[in-house]
């Protein structure tokens, strides 16, 4: 099991290779990363048998930026018939697993395998259970089968608590018809990724206030309003009338980069298309100057050296807060609903929080 297999957004295979190579160097795990363009996946092949396991034990998956999912294991070839027997034979040295996910890569070829996986899962689950290799137990490893085709599969393991919360790392979020734009799903996914679900009532509630910079027409504002917050929407463009009719939104025609609230707010969100360094500096200022307690800001990525640029900006933000003596939790992820961008979440840890009713 010396290969670490990772899913990603098509076109970002190189960023995954760079990021995982950085991690391997930090953890002294020898090996090499490889990927083909536009395949929506990458691998890190370890020279030592326990290398992939050491990578996974040494890193919280949620803190990786570009990988959507990961698993340690190996590829196997499957015959046209009796695939299950071959899979069971290769699992002889696998531990008993607590859950089973069948996955495909996020490409057109991968999506064509979805129906096959749906039909195959039932018989495979039954066979694994009968062989004593699968039980219902979240404390045990998750068995992840990623099909590259009907004849090739990556047989992998991952800790259910240290891997993606959805199969392939793709959330199943329903677009709310009342929201004025599909960008609303970006902020909802960000909350799922950065905020544990059992903390939503404490950190996203109706006694809170928020600011949406570059708000029009209101996709992100809608998420704040849906949690009952009072929102100041900053944009020179028009906001959706349905949002204004809620009575929870104040729309100010102003520049998102120069606006500052008169009183501190709980949340600042921003999806302005601008150079990433400028958005990062604004994010650091809002948190550092105490204008907000938590923030979600998108950083649009350059055409080249995307991982290097994100890493540089995150280090600059972290160094800035360290110099100020401010305690901040910093997260960054390329979400499923992101395109040529990543989403940053910052939470100031040394200020009092608003209490839910």
Curated annotation (Swiss-Prot):
For the ligand (S-adenosyl-L-methionine), the binding residues are: 183, 216-219, 235, 255, 271
Q: Which InterPro entries would you find in this protein's record? A: RlmM_FDX, RlmM_THUMP-like, RNA_MeTrfase_FtsJ_dom, rRNA_MeTrfase_M, SAM-dependent_MTases_sf
| Keywords attached to this entry | Cytoplasm, Methyltransferase, rRNA processing, S-adenosyl-L-methionine, Transferase
User: Active site at which residues?
Assistant: 300
Q: Which SUPFAM superfamilies match?
A: S-adenosyl-L-methionine-dependent methyltransferases
- Matching Gene3D superfamilies, A to Z? 3.30.2300.20, 3.30.70.2810, Vaccinia Virus protein VP39
A GO BP term, please?
methylation
* GO annotations of cellular component type: cytoplasm
Catalytic activity, EC? 2.1.1.186
| Keyword S-adenosyl-L-methionine part of the UniProt annotation | yes
* Top-rank lineage group of the source organism: Bacteria
What are this entry's molecular-function GO terms?
A: S-adenosylmethionine-dependent methyltransferase activity
Which catalysed reactions does the entry list for this protein? cytidine(2498) in 23S rRNA + S-adenosyl-L-methionine = 2'-O-methylcytidine(2498) in 23S rRNA + S-adenosyl-L-homocysteine + H(+)
Q: Where in the cell is it found?
A: Cytoplasm
Q: Please report which protein family the annotation says this sequence is part of.
A: Belongs to the class I-like SAM-binding methyltransferase superfamily. RNA methyltransferase RlmE family. RlmM subfamily.
Q: What's its job?
A: Catalyzes the 2'-O-methylation at nucleotide C2498 in 23S rRNA.
Oligomer and partners: Monomer.
- Protein name per UniProt: Ribosomal RNA large subunit methyltransferase M
| Species, as recorded | Pseudomonas fluorescens (strain Pf0-1)
The major lineage groups are:
Bacteria, Pseudomonadati, Pseudomonadota, Gammaproteobacteria, Pseudomonadales
């Amino acid at each position: 099991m010396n290969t670490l297999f990772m899913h990603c957004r098509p076109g970002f295979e190189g960023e995954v290779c760079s990021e995982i190579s950085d991690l391997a160097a930090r953890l002294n795990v020898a090996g090499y990363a490889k990927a083909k363009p536009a395949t929506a996946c990458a691998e890190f092949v370890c020279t030592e048998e326990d290398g992939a396991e050491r990578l996974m034990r040494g890193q919280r998956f949620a803190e990786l930026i570009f990988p959507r999912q990961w698993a340690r294991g190996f590829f196997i070839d499957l015959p046209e018939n009796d695939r299950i027997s071959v899979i069971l034979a290769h699992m002889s040295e696998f531990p008993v697993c607590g859950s089973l996910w069948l996955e495909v890569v996020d490409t057109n070829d991968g999506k064509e395998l979805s129906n096959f996986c749906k039909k195959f899962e039932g018989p495979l689950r039954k066979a694994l259970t009968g062989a004593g290799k699968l039980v219902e137990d979240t404390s045990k490893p998750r068995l992840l089968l990623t099909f590259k085709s009907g004849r090739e599969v990556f047989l992998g393991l991952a800790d259910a608590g240290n891997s993606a919360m959805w199969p392939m790392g793709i959330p199943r979020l329903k677009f709310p018809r009342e929201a004025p734009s599909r960008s609303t799903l970006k902020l909802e996914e960000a909350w799922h990724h950065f905020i544990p679900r059992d903390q939503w009532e404490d950190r996203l509630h109706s006694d809170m206030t928020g600011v949406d910079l570059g708000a029009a027409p209101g996709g992100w504002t809608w998420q704040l309003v849906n949690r009952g917050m009072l929102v100041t929407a900053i944009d020179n463009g028009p906001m959706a009338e349905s949002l204004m009719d809620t009575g929870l939104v104040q729309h100010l025609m102003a520049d998102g980069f120069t606006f500052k609230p008169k009183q501190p707010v709980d949340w600042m969100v921003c999806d302005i298309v601008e150079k990433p360094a400028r958005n990062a500096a604004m994010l650091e200022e809002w948190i550092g100057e105490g204008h907000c307690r938590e923030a979600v800001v998108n950083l649009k990525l350059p055409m080249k050296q995307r991982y290097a640029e994100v890493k540089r900006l995150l280090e600059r933000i972290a160094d800035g807060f360290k110099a100020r003596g401010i305690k901040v939790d910093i997260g960054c992820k390329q979400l499923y609903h992101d395109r040529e961008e990543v989403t940053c979440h910052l939470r100031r840890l040394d200020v009092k929080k608003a209490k839910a009713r």
